[in-house]
Each structure stands twice: as C-alpha cells, then as structure tokens.
From Swiss-Prot:
Keywords: Actin-binding, Calmodulin-binding, Phosphoprotein, Repeat. It comes from Rattus norvegicus (Rat). Pfam families: Calponin (PF00402), CH (PF00307). The gene is Cnn1. Thin filament-associated protein that is implicated in the regulation and modulation of smooth muscle contraction. It is capable of binding to actin, calmodulin and tropomyosin. The interaction of calponin with actin inhibits the actomyosin Mg-ATPase activity. SMART domains: CH (SM00033). It comes from the Eukaryota. This is Calponin-1. Part of cGMP kinase signaling complex at least composed of ACTA2/alpha-actin, CNN1/calponin H1, PLN/phospholamban, PRKG1 and ITPR1. Smooth muscle, and tissues containing significant amounts of smooth muscle. One of its GO terms (biological process) is actomyosin structure organization. Belongs to the calponin family. The keyword Repeat applies.
C-alpha cells in the first residue's frame, strides 16, 4: 500500500452543507493555544498545518505519554496508513483511560480523513481540562469541578425530613389550621369574640345562597307519579290502581291472560273445542268418541 493518505471525493448536497457548518465552528484562536501547549509538552514542532502535523498520530502518542507516562507502549514511526491509524487508535484508548469522557472523543477518521476537525479540536480541549484537574499547568480549556463528597450521620438525615427546604419555596409561616374540606360549610364567626354559634346544619346559610323558603317536602323520586291534588283542601285521593289520563290511556286493555315471555301460547278457544272424556273404571278402555287435539305454537 502506498504511503499516501486516503483521499475522499468532494462532498455535494447535504453532506457538503454539514461539512461547511462543522468547519464554521472551528476556532483558530484555540488552535494556536493548543499548538503552543502540545509543542511545549512534547518539544516537537507540529508544522504549518496543525491537523496535517497530527495526522500520523506520532505527536499525539508522545503527548499523552508526557501527560501520563506509559499510556502508549509502542509508537509506530512508519509512514504506512495502517500504522498511522494504529497510532491514532492508541491515542484514543489512552485518553479514555486518562479520564476524557467518551462523548468528547473524536473518531480516527475525523482526523485521518479530514472529516471533522472541529471534533478533534474539542477532544484536545477536553484533554486540557482533564489535565488541569490532575495538576498540570495548562492555559487552555476550563478546569473541571472536583467532586466534593459529604457524609452525614443517619440522625442528621432524619432531622432534615422535618424541614422544608428553600428549594421548594417558603410557606411564609402559613398553615392549614382552620381549613375545612373542599365543599363543606365555612362559618364566619370567631369563638373568641363570644358571638352566637353558627346555624344548625339543617339551615342553609346566606353564604351559600338562599332557597327563598323552598324545601324538598312532597318531592318524589324521578319517574314516579306526581299527585295533582292538595290533601289540605279536602280533595279525594287519586286511585292508584287506575292509570291516570295524565300518563296516557290503555284503552281498556289489561294483562289478563298473558303468559310469561317464552312460554307456549294456546291458539284454540275452549268454546269450540270438546272437553276430553276419560273412561270410568268400569268401562272399557276403548272410547269411540273422536279425539280432541290441543294445538300449541
């Protein structure tokens, strides 16, 4: 295989648009800061093109070995493509063990095939931030916050359950004292003032509105008969056995002779059918009378 790097064809359409947006996020000032930091740690010159100088992975492997000795056991000086890709892969594994988060690390092709230089720069900035937390004097990136663990006794934790934290807001010394359930009566009197006791529960207070003397006396359940006479006037009671015209008329019909739903219905009239005769005990069993048939549906 030749020593030339892999070359991709030009990007078109959406791929070109995405590549241009990523390129616009690249910070050249940060690049200069990273160049000075890496060259100062390794003692090697990167070259005029920053990304091309890091593409073989040699400087990157030496750089992580300076920050964390023994991170990369073998650095390939060969110009073959697979050796250079191996160097980049070893660098990625080393910074992962160093503490850089996986979502901050670039892929090998982002650098080797020039697909995403912005992500490569972000990885180096994340490495600088991690180096600061380990005591290295770096002027690039921001220092990660150190973990501050606190241990509390179980008694102290139980006491905290009785306190409303300011995170939840403050009740301003308000309480639910004197509050009643939703929908119940509210009495507008103060027992300390010696005022009269509230009305009995059978009276509707004016706070709830007024019924204007109306009551539910004489009201019946929905669907039942409504008597249209007044007993106080001496009127006669309505006959409850008859269907009043207020409910409509049955035109003299009744349920007499009706059977339960599903039973057989007799379709003969006894006036036109002979009564069956049965032989007496002393008579012969044969009867010459015509048979009577009972037809049923």
């Amino acid at each position: 295989m030749s020593s030339a790097h892999f070359n991709r064809g030009p990007a078109y359409g959406l791929s070109a648009e995405v590549k241009n947006k990523l390129a616009q996020k690249y910070d050249h000032q940060r690049e200069q800061e990273l160049r000075e930091w890496i060259e100062g740690v390794t003692g090697r010159r990167i070259g005029s093109n920053f990304m091309d100088g890091l593409k073989d992975g040699i400087i990157l492997c030496e750089f992580i070995n300076k920050l964390q000795p023994g991170s990369v056991k073998k650095v390939n000086e060969s110009t073959q493509n697979w050796h250079q890709l191996e160097n980049i892969g070893n660098f990625i594994k080393a910074i992962t063990k160093y503490g850089v988060k996986p979502h901050d690390i670039f892929e090998a092709n982002d650098l080797f095939e020039n697909t995403n230089h912005t992500q490569v720069q972000s990885t180096l900035l994340a490495l600088a931030s991690m180096a600061k937390t380990k005591g290295n004097k770096v002027n690039v990136g921001v220092k990660y916050a150190e973990k501050q663990e606190r241990r509390f006794e179980p008694e102290k934790l139980r006491e905290g359950r009785n306190i409303i934290g300011l995170q939840m807001g403050t009740n301003k010394f308000a309480s639910q004292q004197g509050m009643t359930a939703y929908g119940t009566r509210r009495h507008l009197y103060d027992p300390k003032l010696g005022t009269d006791q509230p009305l009995d529960q059978a009276t509707i207070s004016l706070q709830m509105g007024t019924n204007k003397g109306a009551s539910q006396a004489g009201m019946t359940a929905p669907g039942t008969k409504r008597q249209i006479f007044e007993p106080g006037l001496g009127m006669e009671h309505c006959d409850t056995l008859n269907v009043s015209l207020q409910m409509g008329s049955n035109k003299g019909a009744s349920q007499r002779g009706m059977t339960v739903y599903g039973l057989p219905r007799q379709v003969y009239d006894p006036k036109y059918c002979l009564t069956p005769e049965y032989p007496e005990l002393d008579e012969p069993t044969h009867n010459h009378h015509p048979h009577n048939y009972y037809n049923s549906a």
